[in-house]
Amino acid sequence: MKTKIAKHLLQIKAVSLKPDEPFTWASGIKSPIYCDNRLTLSYPEVRHDIAEGLKELILTHFEGAEVIAGTATAGIPHAALAADRLNAPMCYVRSKPKAHGKGNQIEGAVSKGQKVVVVEDLISTGGSVLEVVAALQEAGCDVLGVAAIFTYGLPKATAAFQEKNIPYVTLTDYDTLTDVALELKAIEPSAMNKLKRWRQDPSSESWMEETV
């Protein structure tokens, strides 16, 4: 599954790799990779495989899940598709409460004590999805963990999830994707060193330097 989803993401250009012309993230980080999983919704086969994959992840790793929660906004459609396949209730969670109306942060019916799995499209540092987890926990839910399409596998994310004692699983990951990209000739072999060095310390720009 990891290889299949990685190929999908590369072939539809949901993931772009440019180690020699790095992207600038909103945080200011210079990155050789950019991921836009919203594109997956436009491709029925890809969308189907992601939904089936998320269903299997949830059944395998989060036994007893009662509610599927999507992160606003990118996680919502994938949560809905997975919940439909699981015949489970679904809700979604904003990063912060609405400033008007009822001021809801959680939209949908969810009750105290219910076992919830959060669906996210992408895990970078883990900060935003863990805010969603915290909101659900504050509402009295038992959050079993997070299921996502892709993770960069950053050390910061691993540490953040461990600190909160929240497990997470993904359909594919950075190592798989870069290996598949090399196989598909989407990157040159010489680029692999830069890609590995960036992942070790994304906040440093030393990965962009040429090494002998």
Curated annotation (Swiss-Prot):
Pathway membership, UniProt: Pyrimidine metabolism; UMP biosynthesis via de novo pathway; UMP from orotate: step 1/2
Binding site for orotate: 124
Record's catalysed reaction(s): orotidine 5'-phosphate + diphosphate = orotate + 5-phospho-alpha-D-ribose 1-diphosphate
CDD domains the UniProt entry points to: PRTases_typeI (cd06223)
Keyword annotations of the record: Glycosyltransferase, Magnesium, Pyrimidine biosynthesis, Transferase
Broadest EC class assigned to this enzyme: transferase
PROSITE patterns attached to this UniProt entry: PUR_PYR_PR_TRANSFER
Disulfide bonds: none
Molecular function GO terms recorded: magnesium ion binding; orotate phosphoribosyltransferase activity
One matching Pfam family: Pribosyltran
Family membership noted in the UniProt record: Belongs to the purine/pyrimidine phosphoribosyltransferase family. PyrE subfamily.
Subunit-level organization: Homodimer.
HAMAP family: PyrE (MF_01208)
Name the UniProt record assigns to this protein: Orotate phosphoribosyltransferase
Organism lineage string: Bacteria, Bacillati, Bacillota, Bacilli, Bacillales
